[in-house]
Amino acid sequence: MGKGRALSDGVIKKIILSYTYVAIWIFLSFTVIVYNKYILDKKMYNWPFPITLTMIHMGFCSSLAVILIKVFKVVEPVSMSRETYLRSVVPIGALYSLSLWLSNSAYIYLSVSFIQMLKALMPVAVYSIGVLLKKETFKSQTMTNMLSISFGVAIAAYGEAKFDGWGVFLQLGAVAFEATRLVLIQILLTSKGINLNPITSLYYVAPCCLVFLSVPWIFVEFPVLRDTSSFHFDFVIFGTNSVCAFALNLAVFLLVGKTSALTMNVAGVVKDWLLIAFSWSVIKDTVTPINLFGYGLAFLGVGYYNHCKLQALKAKDAQKKVQASDDEAGKLLEERESEAKRNETQD
């Protein structure tokens, strides 16, 4: 009886911890998105310099990552040759810098709610690029689902009250670069047995991003910042914003480490709906019924996609267990046969 109660208490504690990690990740992801919107939007803080903001984040995060790995030794650095770094990490850093630059730029032109709706295209982009790079197998059923997600997002875009073509182009570009980055991580790193958690990712990738972003920054934003009072650095705003960005990476580390990547995907859907509600109720962005209908269709498609991924993972785990039990049975049979032969020899 006591053992059963202890077991149930342990399960309850694990469930509470899992929900706590999910809540922390949703809160921090929510905060970073709204904070970035506040800084970049011309109607709010009015500091429309997305490259500079991204560089501040990368500089802060890479510095803290070095301290956590080299000084406090929170996690071990991954052993990596210079050639592997240049061929694998640098291309990923280039794509990440482009993705962050474009996604932050989109906040200047689009509402938070509409950006979240456009982000629903991420599974479509990841699957399509995966098929093109031969990392995913083409399946007509999966592609039909991807088309339904795209159709839902198209309806949401059609119903957008403050549609901005340039903003949509920036956000779609960010989705495309991010999807390519995710696929390349599998091809260039995971396939080679190199697994980077969010802290080691920042340690290796953030300095790359800083270097790549400095090139467009010198020509696009630096001249404007130099010639205006916008060059004044607000330590409170940018300091707290950078802390939130780094804390979000730690939250991803905790969430994926203690639960799973699929849990993060499901939590991401909840976060998107909360952001849409916040954008409509607090920021007073216009959310039309056509917006919601289109995003609802895309949401169902994304939900079905996540369900299929979960079923595939379960089937894979079950197959591994069957294989393991077969191997164990084979070893037992071999042991019995060898024991029988020994007995025959002794007789």
Swiss-Prot record:
User: What is its membrane topology?
Assistant: Multi-pass membrane protein
Protein's UniProt keywords contain Transport: yes
What is the protein's major site of localization? membrane
| Family matches, as InterPro entries | Sugar_P_trans_dom, TPT_transporter
Per the record, its GO cellular-component terms are:
endosome; Golgi apparatus; membrane; trans-Golgi network; vacuole
Q: What subcellular compartments does it reside in?
A: Membrane
Q: Which cysteines are joined by disulfide bonds?
A: none
* Recorded superkingdom: Eukaryota
- Modified-residue entries (Phosphoserine), positions: 325
The residue ranges of the EamA domain are 38-155
In this record, what's one Pfam family? TPT
Residues that span the membrane, as ranges: 15-35, 49-69, 89-109, 112-132, 143-163, 165-185, 205-225, 235-255, 263-283, 286-306
Print the keywords alphabetically. Membrane, Phosphoprotein, Sugar transport, Transmembrane, Transmembrane helix, Transport
User: Family, per the entry?
Assistant: Belongs to the TPT transporter family. TPT (TC 2.A.7.9) subfamily.
Q: PANTHER family in the record, alphabetically? A: SOLUTE CARRIER FAMILY 35
* Name used for this protein in its record: Probable sugar phosphate/phosphate translocator At2g25520
